[in-house]
Amino acid sequence: METTSKKTLNVLSIDYDYFMKFKDDDTGPLASFPDGTEQFIGVSDYVWASRLACEYSSREIAKVSCNSDELFEVWKFLMKQRKSVPVLITNSHMHIHGFIKENIGEMDSVRVVNLDFHHDAYDKGGNGELNCGNWVNFLDREFTLEYDWVTSDCGWNAAGKKPRILEGRPRFRSISEFRKANPKFKPDIIFICRSDVWVPPHMDSQFLSFAFDVCGRFKNIRGNTEVLKKRDIGKYVLQIKQSMEKLNKEYSCSAK
């Protein structure tokens, strides 16, 4: 990739949880989610299963759907980009840090446009180690960083107090709003993550359709093949429910 003619690496970051849609005044769905702690692929399946095995949590999580209209708008933007743009598709947002360092070359600054339910500039957790919730801070320490966060009203309201890096930055609610304000933005690299610890498994079908379209569009693409498979949570939910039923029976017998 050419790096000598410019000083800034333009990055388009797409976290699939950006497309989560639910009533922004309904706290039930998020309260029923896992805590978002970084997990390996597969481990997060068990975590989700533990929530979905509970009738109340399962009902609340089911309220979350995919914003298909916004997903299509993002796809239209991707269709306008060069087919040779490097693309990485993976499970966790933490991998964007390494992807950027691989492509930064001699450039000394980074501009990240992050489509995300979360701003990912959190300081808590991880014992200071890189994770899916603090990678923005790592980039801010290592490079001159220009950061734009594109998020829905649900994401904006759920974030609470905003981090310093967003001070003075415009707010964008959609890719269309961002494009209108930044018509010349062209990404040098594109990062996509499924965010297994945040996106409910029932949204996998739309992600797979989107990811396979991306794979068919771009030539320089790589990633974790596990995120190109639908998560099979049902068997774990059944196991947990059966274990809970067994424990309840044993407790009932011992209490007599």
What are these regions (language model features)?
Residues 2-256:
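Conserved alpha-helical scaffold segments that buttress catalytic/binding sites
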